[in-house]
């Protein structure tokens, strides 16, 4: 959905149910920028952020805590999570970006001067989060008076940030420079932790000994809920200023003031009188404090865990719990047949670039064997090594092979959305063949332990609608390996936009020593080891007709990407390949029946040419050049969490190459 606001008019796109929030936001602009004329080009947070805040408050009041997820289709309404507008548009978006470490511009920045678009987008989410934190600090009733006074005082006027701050201090009768300086002028984050909770008994009186730590640089007053053994709860307020910022109920206990900022005085302990032994403590049960790591906001050694079914489409992480998604899974191969099992995906606030305690894997029962099929992957960020740096481990055990890899990955970038950026990965991997009966006859695998050091460097660029990436992979055997070899490959992919889209891929590889056949790069596609790691191929060997596999009709993208029938039995010393393809749809749209058949079926035609020049182990060089056409259709029926799949048929005719024959191939993945 997309929309634009005008006084007494909104222009909106999209459909149900997403348009509800969009419409609410654009209508909200009639108050903030329409009636209260803040200058969006100067300080956008007064416009977009205030509108985001009132949109969340109004929508959550009208539709409840599922206001942002009004699903209508059966599957979505049954299995998708229900979330509030406050969560979707404010808390989640701000917290994810703040956790990345790339928030470099404070809210109090001219709209034209933000480092990148993602930093600018914080004027929406972070501002609304700031106002919810102000509500938490002053109390809901006081903040309502602040907003009403600000609105009425600057109706049809042009206020600036200092005007709102002055109103907030006047209405609340509190000095709030400490609050607004943190939220508007800095990029520091809020992160508190409960480090210890003990139950004490002194002279027949019960006390809760509570220890806290401020891990982030931002300071805020704290509301903490204590749960007692007798079932009662007690609220504790820890002020950070000389005077409480809000009125508290008489039943609340006001603890001593916690004075501290940045790393100064970042620990705190208090003894709270209670009526019964304490069993649990929780920071901010209202969920308004934008603490970027809430797993330690609850006492105990094991953090809260949210067990839920995996709908395979939409994931909204729980802000105050570790998510575990479960679903059934299965695999199929020609030896074991059907292998049922369970798949899990877990982590804290998972996203595309910062995955904390991310674990994913499956356990399947092999019907023809006593041992299970197991896959396990784990990664977590290591912040002291730099933004977007993760360590990872990957383990696989199947009837065909077993492998284990451990390493680290880091991205070097100027921002989340900024190009170019670099991706560097270093790992150690070990693998071995368990049984050759799982592979098709044309695949050559060798028994023995393969142990290697792997280095990878990727460079990614974008300009306009064109994108590209260049990836260098280096692999060398290490002690303990039964094979002594070295391998270097360079892969480039450039997706260019002219009058027709033009995709150009190049592959260059060099290898020496006793390269295991399953690791060796190939003319027709990816290496055998990389191929069997693709679930669709591993299962397809038993599902597709024998003619498909025995005659190379199944194409695994990679390597030289040749589609004509050209099988070599000896290893290659080096290879250079160029793959060029284009989608000629714009030329075909005027053909009779194109819209009714090709376009309606969502089929994408491709025209491609491939050139390969290589040397085999006998020092013989050969060249093959082919051309062909293909048809590709997205398999949208498969949930995106299972991967991006297509149905692809390519037909190739050799133009030059003495041993090549025309051929057709089938695949469930794109060429590149």
Predicted segments, located by residue:
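Hydrophobic alpha-helical and helix-loop surface patches within well-folded domains
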Residues: 1-221, 225, 229-232, 281
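Outer-membrane beta-barrel strand-turn architecture
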Residues: 138, 172, 332-334, 348-351, ...
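Solvent-exposed loop/turn segments connecting transmembrane beta-strands
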Residues: 156-157, 329-342, 347-354, 360-374, ...
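Outer-membrane beta-barrel initiation region
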Residues: 232, 270-273, 284-384, 414, ...
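Solvent-exposed beta-strand/loop surfaces of large extracellular or lumenal domains
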Residues: 232-267
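Outer-envelope beta-barrel architecture signal
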Residues: 322-326, 336-340, 353-359, 372, ...
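C-terminal outer-membrane beta-barrel translocator/porin domains of Gram-negative envelope proteins
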Residues: 330, 387-399, 403-410, 421-427, ...
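Outer-membrane beta-barrel "beta-signal"
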Residues: 628-629, 661-672
């Amino acid at each position: 959905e997309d929309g634009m606001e005008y006084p007494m008019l909104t222009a909106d796109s999209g459909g149900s149910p997403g348009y509800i929030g969009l419409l609410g936001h654009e209508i909200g602009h009639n108050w903030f920028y329409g009636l209260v004329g803040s200058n969006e080009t100067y300080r956008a947070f007064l416009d977009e952020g205030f509108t985001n805040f009132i949109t969340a408050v109004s929508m959550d009041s009208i539709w409840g805590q599922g206001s942002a997820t009004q699903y209508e289709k059966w599957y979505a309404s049954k299995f998708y999570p229900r979330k509030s507008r406050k969560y979707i548009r404010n808390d989640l978006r701000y917290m994810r970006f703040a956790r990345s470490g790339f928030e470099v511009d404070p809210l109090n920045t001219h709209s034209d001067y933000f480092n990148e678009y993602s930093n600018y987008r914080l004027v929406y989410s972070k501002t609304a989060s700031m106002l919810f934190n102000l509500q938490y600090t002053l109390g809901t009733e006081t903040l309502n008076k602040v907003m009403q006074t600000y609105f009425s005082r600057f109706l049809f006027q042009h206020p600036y940030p200092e005007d709102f701050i002055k109103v907030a201090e006047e209405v609340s009768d509190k000095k709030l420079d400490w609050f607004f300086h943190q939220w508007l002028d800095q990029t520091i984050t809020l992160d508190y932790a409960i480090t210890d909770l003990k139950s004490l008994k002194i002279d027949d009186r019960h006390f809760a000994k509570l220890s806290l730590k401020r891990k982030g640089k931002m300071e805020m007053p704290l509301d903490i809920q204590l749960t007692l053994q007798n079932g009662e709860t007690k609220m504790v307020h820890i002020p950070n200023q000389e005077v409480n910022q809000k009125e508290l109920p008489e039943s609340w206990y006001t603890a001593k003031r916690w004075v501290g900022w940045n790393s100064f005085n970042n620990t705190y302990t208090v003894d709270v009188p209670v009526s019964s032994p304490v069993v649990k403590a929780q920071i901010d049960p209202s969920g308004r404090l934008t603490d970027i790591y809430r797993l330690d906001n609850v006492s105990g050694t094991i953090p809260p865990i949210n067990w839920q079914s995996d709908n395979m489409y939409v994931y909204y992480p729980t802000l105050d719990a570790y998510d575990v998604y479960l679903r059934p899974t299965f695999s199929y191969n020609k030896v074991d047949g059907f292998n049922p099992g369970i798949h899990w995906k877990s982590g804290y606030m998972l996203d595309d670039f910062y995955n904390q305690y991310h674990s994913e894997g499956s356990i399947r029962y092999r019907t023809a064997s006593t041992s299970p099929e197991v896959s396990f992957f784990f990664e977590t960020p290591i912040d002291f090594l730099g933004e977007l740096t993760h360590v990872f481990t990957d383990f696989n055990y199947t009837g065909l092979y077993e492998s284990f890899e451990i390493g680290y990955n880091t991205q070097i970038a100027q921002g989340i959305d900024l190009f170019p950026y670099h991706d560097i990965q270093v790992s150690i991997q070990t693998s071995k063949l368990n049984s050759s009966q799982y592979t098709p006859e044309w695949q050559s695998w060798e028994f023995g332990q393969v142990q290697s050091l792997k280095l990878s460097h990727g460079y990614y660029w974008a300009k306009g609608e064109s994108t590209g990436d260049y990836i260098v992979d280096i692999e060398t055997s290490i002690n303990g390996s039964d094979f002594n070899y070295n391998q270097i490959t360079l892969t480039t992919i450039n997706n260019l936009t002219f009058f027709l889209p033009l995709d150009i891929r190049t592959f260059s590889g060099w290898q020496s020593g006793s390269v295991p056949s399953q690791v060796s790069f190939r003319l027709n596609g990816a290496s055998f080891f990389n191929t069997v790691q693709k679930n669709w191929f591993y299962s397809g060997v038993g599902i597709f007709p024998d003619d498909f596999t025995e005659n190379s009709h199944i194409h695994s993208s990679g390597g030289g990407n040749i589609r004509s029938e050209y099988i070599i039995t000896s290893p290659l010393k080096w290879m250079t390949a160029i793959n060029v393809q284009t989608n000629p749809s714009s030329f075909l749209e005027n053909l009779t029946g194109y819209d009714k058949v090709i376009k309606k079926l969502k089929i994408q035609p491709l025209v491609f040419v491939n050139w390969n020049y290589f040397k085999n182990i006998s020092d013989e060089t050969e060249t093959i050049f082919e051309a062909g056409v293909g048809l590709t259709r997205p398999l949208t029926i498969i949930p995106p969490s299972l991967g991006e799949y297509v149905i692809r048929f390519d037909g190739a005719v050799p133009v030059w190459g003495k041993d090549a024959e025309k051929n057709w191939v089938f695949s469930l993945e794109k060429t590149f």
